[in-house]
């Protein structure tokens, strides 16, 4: 990026294009917006490319509750370049290639300093505010001066955005930016669940419920750890061929199992159950099947899917008593600033398959087409280029 552009805009609002969601479920509108300069502990970044995640789809449709606010700028998977920095910003400078990440890592609280969790006790409970340290204060306004709300502290469906340093990761400029964007949410979530949460070991058996991008990323993580059998469960058999690229060895379509439960089929395939199961859909009923599909005494189930209705989970107490374990996984147990550069390094060493996640590439102006592709199940990850 031209250095004169940096100097001419530093400390001033920037006018740029953004895709604004003005009402739940309605088509996004490309409009001119004003992006304020970063405040203390904030960075303004130029988005190079962004991608769609099912979470964007969920919040696009959400028409009730405190986190349903419009107009807003969605988007949270992206890669960008630092355009300017606010006060008290260490570790970032103009021109750095960065990933914005929805999950905070403040580096200072008890949990961030702990090796046991990736939770941030200081910030992670708040999903409602526009800006991390300034509450409902927004850095976005439309051309008429109306405030535009942020989304998950990222808002990447804009040519420029402002992100708190707790949500920002500096990465190597050697990785292609479209591949890098995938690591800011879904792919990292899946790989991290296999590596950090489950700690899959060589020779283990795996069952993955739901073969979207997160489920496929779990398989990629398990493959790299040397899992012997990776079973994919999905009602869409078309995903099975793609799944082989990520290490799946077997597939189950629940609609073709007759009267047998999925857990029964898995136990027959694995002589009593898998070592690890991963629920990547977000259904309480499916979580129970994932739990029962693991081995008695040692089986571990990891929940990655978000149950949007917060339905209660029903598990047999006797199954728990006999040693099965269940746990949740938010952002794959990863501490963003520490672990994402490691994933970048694995890609640069040609060990990590990121290329196969990208099924479509479009110009940013075609963002509504990208939403339609994802909603119809035709897209795994669609890269939206800002300048192509």
Curated annotation (Swiss-Prot):
Cofactor binding, note field: Binds 2 Zn(2+) ions per subunit.
Any one of the GO CC terms: nucleus
Binding site for Zn(2+) 2: 106, 109, 112, 120
Binding site for NAD(+): 55, 210-215, 234, 239, 304-306, 331, 381
The keyword Metal-binding is assigned to this record: yes
Cofactor(s) needed: Zn(2+)
Record InterPro entries: ADH-like_C, ADH-like_N, ADH_Zn_CS, GroES-like_sf, NAD(P)-bd_dom_sf
Cross-referenced Pfam families: ADH_N, ADH_zinc_N
Superkingdom to which the source organism belongs: Eukaryota
Binding site for Zn(2+) 1: 53, 55, 76, 185
Residues that bind an alcohol: 55, 76
EC numbers on record: 1.1.1.1
Subcellular location: Cytoplasm
Keywords, comma-separated and alphabetical: Cytoplasm, Metal-binding, NAD, Oxidoreductase, Zinc
GO molecular function, one term: alcohol dehydrogenase (NAD+) activity
Catalytic activity: a primary alcohol + NAD(+) = an aldehyde + NADH + H(+); a secondary alcohol + NAD(+) = a ketone + NADH + H(+)
Main location group: cytoplasm
Residues of the signal peptide: none
Recorded family membership: Belongs to the zinc-containing alcohol dehydrogenase family. Class-III subfamily.
Subunit structure: Homodimer.
PANTHER family per UniProt: ALCOHOL DEHYDROGENASE, ALCOHOL DEHYDROGENASE-LIKE 1-RELATED
Name of the molecule in the record: Alcohol dehydrogenase-like 1
The organism's taxonomic lineage, starting at the top: Eukaryota, Viridiplantae, Streptophyta, Embryophyta, Tracheophyta
